Amino acid sequence: MSQISAKDVKNLRDITGAGMMDCKKALDETGGDMQQAIDYLRKKGAALAAKRADRDAREGMVEIKMTADHKAGIILELNCETDFVARGEDFTNFTVALGELALAKCISSPEALMTLTLGEAYGGETVDDAIKTMTGKLGEKISLKRLVYIDAGDGVVESYVHPGAQLGAIIHLATDQPDAVRELARDLAMQVAAAAPIVVDRSFVPADYIAKEAEIYRQQALEQGKKEAFVDKIVLGRLEKYYQDVVLSEQFFIKDSTVKVSDVLNEFRKKHQVKVDVIGFVRCKLGE
């Protein structure tokens, strides 16, 4: 068995929120394997949350740019150290410039954007050099955390950025009537930003992951003293709740909590005689 260090225990506590003794025991029981220790704590009900809140979130800005015909778009996150700098004109303008460049050149990763050249406003420097220059000018570390480019083809992209530019989402719909679905697409982008789904529908959730979650729920129920005869029903109920949390089509619609997103899509198709499906989306929350 590997030696369990105090640092390992602290790291596990930071990840799970569980007590020090629970973390020590989990690592002992799993031979020091961090992922197995996390699963162990979840099964025992000792983990307080699957992920931490935004305590370690950096400051910065989420930027979204789309082409005029809404056939393509980008979403990016640029980080700095303080809210003061994030709200400043220099940082804001620089973020916008990066978004415009990424969209114009169809760039889909931070690494690819770094090699491109900015315009005269930034001395014709590469993005990499311009970030270094901006770091010196503002006196804070500036870093491009993420960047995603979406090409909708014959479909449409739409977006939503929450006031303050710390949260945004961009969504891709396949449709035979792009102009007709723009308002719906924006509502769905807002849904993604607010409700934080992970996948479009159940088919995107790996079967092995669901099996693992089901086993965790089963062990939790047994640890709570639930009777074996009721455990399967409890597991199914918790899986349904999980789907409602992470699957876009099964979430309740933010504009009408009596219907699900799937219902909204079906009703829209019937009412407007239009083909429309959600292909994908990207949600970006500062610091996550």
Swiss-Prot record:
<dbReference type="InterPro" id="IPR018101">
    <property type="entry name" value="Transl_elong_Ts_CS"/>
</dbReference>
<keyword id="KW-0963">Cytoplasm</keyword>
<dbReference type="GO" id="GO:0005737">
    <property type="term" value="C:cytoplasm"/>
</dbReference>
<comment type="similarity">
    <text>Belongs to the EF-Ts family.</text>
</comment>
<dbReference type="InterPro" id="IPR036402">
    <property type="entry name" value="EF-Ts_dimer_sf"/>
</dbReference>
<protein>
    <recommendedName>
        <fullName>Elongation factor Ts</fullName>
    </recommendedName>
</protein>
<comment type="function">
    <text>Associates with the EF-Tu.GDP complex and induces the exchange of GDP to GTP. It remains bound to the aminoacyl-tRNA.EF-Tu.GTP complex up to the GTP hydrolysis stage on the ribosome.</text>
</comment>
<keyword id="KW-0648">Protein biosynthesis</keyword>
<dbReference type="InterPro" id="IPR009060">
    <property type="entry name" value="UBA-like_sf"/>
</dbReference>
<keyword id="KW-0251">Elongation factor</keyword>
<dbReference type="InterPro" id="IPR001816">
    <property type="entry name" value="Transl_elong_EFTs/EF1B"/>
</dbReference>
<feature type="region of interest" description="Involved in Mg(2+) ion dislocation from EF-Tu">
    <location>
        <begin position="82"/>
        <end position="85"/>
    </location>
</feature>
<dbReference type="Pfam" id="PF00889">
    <property type="entry name" value="EF_TS"/>
</dbReference>
<dbReference type="GO" id="GO:0003746">
    <property type="term" value="F:translation elongation factor activity"/>
</dbReference>
<dbReference type="InterPro" id="IPR014039">
    <property type="entry name" value="Transl_elong_EFTs/EF1B_dimer"/>
</dbReference>
